[in-house]
Amino acid sequence: MKRLGIFFFYEKNGDVDDFITYYLRDLARNLTELIVVCNGKLSKQGRAAFEEFTDQIIVRENKGLDVWAYKTALDHYGWQRLSEFDEVVMTNSTLMGPVRPLKEMFDAMAERTNLDFWGLTIHHGAEGNPFKGKHLYNYLPVHIQSHFIVYRKKFIQSKELQNYWDTMPMIESYTDSVQRYESVFTKQFADKGYQWDVYVNTDDLKEFTDYPLLVCPTRLLRDKKCPLFKRRSFMHDFEAYLNDTAGEPVRELYAYLRDHTDYPLELIWKNMIRTMHPYDFTRNLGLTRLIPERVQDEASAAAVRNNRRIALCMHLYFMDMLPQSCAFAANMPPETDVFISTNTPEKKQQIEEAFRTLPLHAVTVKVVENRGRDVAAFLCDLAPQIREYDYACFMHDKKAIQTKPGSVGASFGYVCNENICKNADYVLNVLTEFEKDPYLGLLCPPFPTHGVYFMNMCSNGWGPNFDNTKALMKKLGIDRPISGEKMPIAPFGSVFWFRVKALAPLFDHGWQHEDFPPEPLPQDGTISHAIERIYPFVAQGAGYYPAQAMSADYAVARCDSMQAYAGGLIRPLARVFDCTTFGSAAASAGAFAARRHWFGFGNYGPYENSKRRRARNWLRKRMPKSAYENMMRVKRTVLGPHDVNYED
């Protein structure tokens, strides 16, 4: 069979990951010719990767999405040349695999001689139009999904298909692509009498889900011999999964790929770490570590102690907390080298005396400049001493003295220490996590949610620090996904474990204490707060990913507290909004909040957005104090907030 393949590719930097060449290597065995169409850039590496399979590579302006990429290839060949092929396959880089030879699929479908066009999988449609804008049918028809669709010769030669593509309007958005092409193509040509079908029959799943390849991919791979799966599975909004599942689809998919196929899992990891936000893939894959309190693997624990260099970095300032700091260090393996910074010779002497009796390999205490606090001490003074180590932990004697009541700050310290260094066995289990997972770069405690820290969930943990973190990433040359709508998997509180190689790009910057503001240090929005949030992105840039670690005790408390938060919010919301599902509740409440904000009556807390805070700071610096306070008093009287503590 003479078969042409059209492969559409887009990646913002034009780099071609190995999962694509793995897919093309099998696909090409079933093709006579292959043409690749790239929207936007194609790097030197990317071109070399595609040239393994074809010399027909078109790089075009990034417009029209996949639809116009396919149209470009069709126009390049022309209908006369296209009519010489028995089949034209159109597919793209949104698919991963195969987990079984594609030849099985092509051979099976070759026997279906009655078909004019066919595909891999089907979307079962929806009663209404889930997209904004006008839809051809005002509902979502059953349709072949556009990630893999095949035209047969008779269909290619038809005037209806040729006219369809010749008159295809420019596609302006993803929604436009779905509504003008993917969701309507199948019905349009079925209504004209053309025959179609898909390789993966999911008629039995119509009542189960409208999108089987995303919602139950394991069933399709295991039970229906589907050879491919969606890359999007790993970066799909976890909240969207919760509308139809308990969050298990991607975890089941990964387990099946790991245990029942020979698909190279490193192809998934490398692409995830390079191109996806860890907030998405760590939740979809369930990468949060529940660390046991007793050693689970004696052999692995012994291997870490014998074969890896382990360091503990500590910045100690509060001498009344020295006993707690010693207890923290005492949980480290005896082979650990400890590097401590403090700000006075007197404190140095106290620390050396307190640590003298601890069973540790070596303890080095250094007096450093008292500027930039723990973050500056870590980057300027401690990090240069651990560059040759394998794994390290950083902690400081955290005392959130600005937080009232004091119990709130003390509990923040509990969250950090409980989940990073609960006991000696716990620490060994943490270290074996790094040994077992070559892509793990950072383990940090969960972000605190109690007391005033509840607003972490309101601002996705950014507060006024998104713009300064993004600017710091650019300064350091780190190009990884970052979004103000997604929480960084970061060590809030600056207590965490890390693979030293994972933070090398940050250590290489050559930090000086002058890079940090002098005392009194602002409560938020500084370079230190940006660094606190940039750790996970640095790790990603180095080829690793961040994750959270929790003790079993804390995980139970966390689960209970989240249920308490959810119940406390949902009960009053349900009196006003549609709370049938999480999605409906979020959508209706979000729409209401957006309307209030649009008309000037909204308030999203002290960290609503950094632009507003910067504007207030700009005014505060330039106006007389009394004038500024009067202006803000009028603003609060008219627009609010009226009943919450709010920093103007």
Positions of PLM-derived features:
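ER/Golgi luminal nucleotide-sugar-dependent glycosyltransferases, focusing on the catalytic module
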Residues: M1-D648
